[in-house]
Amino acid sequence: MARKIFKYKGYTLEELQDMSLEEVMELFPARQRRSLKRGFLPRQQIVLDKMRKLNKEGSKDGRPVVIRTHCRDMIVLPEMVGTTFGIYNGQNFVEVTIEPEMIGCYFGEFAPTRQKVQHGDPGMGATRSSMFVPLK
């Protein structure tokens, strides 16, 4: 079975990577377009510079290099596809490898800050009514 070719608003990944930032910006939704029109923040520029440097020289031992960042408001650009980022979620760094489907999204969407609480069985002293729960 043939693998489906990724397209973002009718453009393939190669076409997106050949476009300038201004041309790609016009394809993004309004919120991302507005953010990019204002320019990159200094911390976002640092992330971009690190990524471009590592993509140019590559890793020394063949393993993918993880770029760690606290910058959760960075927008995924076409040139980032294939790069691995460690995105901080407030407790630790979540490793995310950027795929073509992530273009136009924010880093923070891939590293949730809250986890669903999973409560255990009530034990002795867990609640007022647990005084009558037999001990296991």
Curated annotation (Swiss-Prot):
InterPro entries in the cross-refs: Ribosomal_uS19, Ribosomal_uS19_CS, Ribosomal_uS19_euk/arc, Ribosomal_uS19_SF
GO cellular component, one term: cytosolic small ribosomal subunit
Gene Ontology molecular functions: rRNA binding; structural constituent of ribosome
GO biological process, any: ribosomal small subunit assembly
Cross-referenced SUPFAM superfamilies: Ribosomal protein S19
Disordered: annotated segments: 117-136
Keyword tags: Ribonucleoprotein, Ribosomal protein, RNA-binding, rRNA-binding
Family of this protein: Belongs to the universal ribosomal protein uS19 family.
Function: Protein S19 forms a complex with S13 that binds strongly to the 16S ribosomal RNA.
UniProt name for this protein: Small ribosomal subunit protein uS19
